[in-house]
Amino acid sequence: MAFKKKDTENKEFYIVDKRILPKSIQNVIKVNDLILKTKMSKYSAIKKVGISRSTYYKYKDFIKPFYEGGEDRIYSLHLSLKDRVGILSDVLDVIAREKISILTVVQNMAVDGVAKSTILIKLSESMQKKVDKIISKIGKVEGIADIRITGSN
C-alpha cells in the first residue's frame, strides 16, 4: 500500500526480519546501503544492484534501517528464559560488557520452566548500529529460549 505524503494517520510500522522481504525490497535496501556507505551515486548503485529505477523510487522513502535515528533511543528486550539460577545475571553481564545503559528490569515467575523478562535499555546512536551483534551475544547465553527487541521512541 502506497502512502501519500499527507497520510500520517494510517501509517503502521513493523519490525520485520529482512529475510522474509521480497527480493525487490531487499534490493532497495542494498541500494540505500551502497549510497550511504560508499557515497556511490543513486544511478550507479541502482545499476550495480540490478533493479529498475522505478522500483527504487517507488520504495526508497518507505525503507529505513532499524537503527536509524541520530540520538539515544530506548529499546525493550523481551526475553524468554529457561528457569535456572543466574540466567538473568548472565544476560545483564553481557549488556554491561557492551557498556549499555539499563533503565529497568522486570522478571516474572517461571511458568512451565520458562520465565518472561523485559529489560529496558538505552542505546547511543553508535550502539544502535550494532544492535544485531548485541542481540546475538545475548542470545548465546545458555538458557535463552527466545529474544525479541522493540523500539519505544
Curated annotation (Swiss-Prot):
InterPro entries: ACT-like_dom_sf (IPR045865), ACT_dom (IPR002912), UPF0735_ACT_dom-cont (IPR008310)
Cited SUPFAM superfamilies: ACT-like
Boundaries of every ACT domain copy: 76-152
Ranges in a coiled coil: none
A Pfam family the protein falls into: ACT_4
Family: Belongs to the UPF0735 family.
Annotated HAMAP family: UPF0735
Listed name of the protein: UPF0735 ACT domain-containing protein FN1487
Native organism: Fusobacterium nucleatum subsp. nucleatum (strain ATCC 25586 / DSM 15643 / BCRC 10681 / CIP 101130 / JCM 8532 / KCTC 2640 / LMG 13131 / VPI 4355)
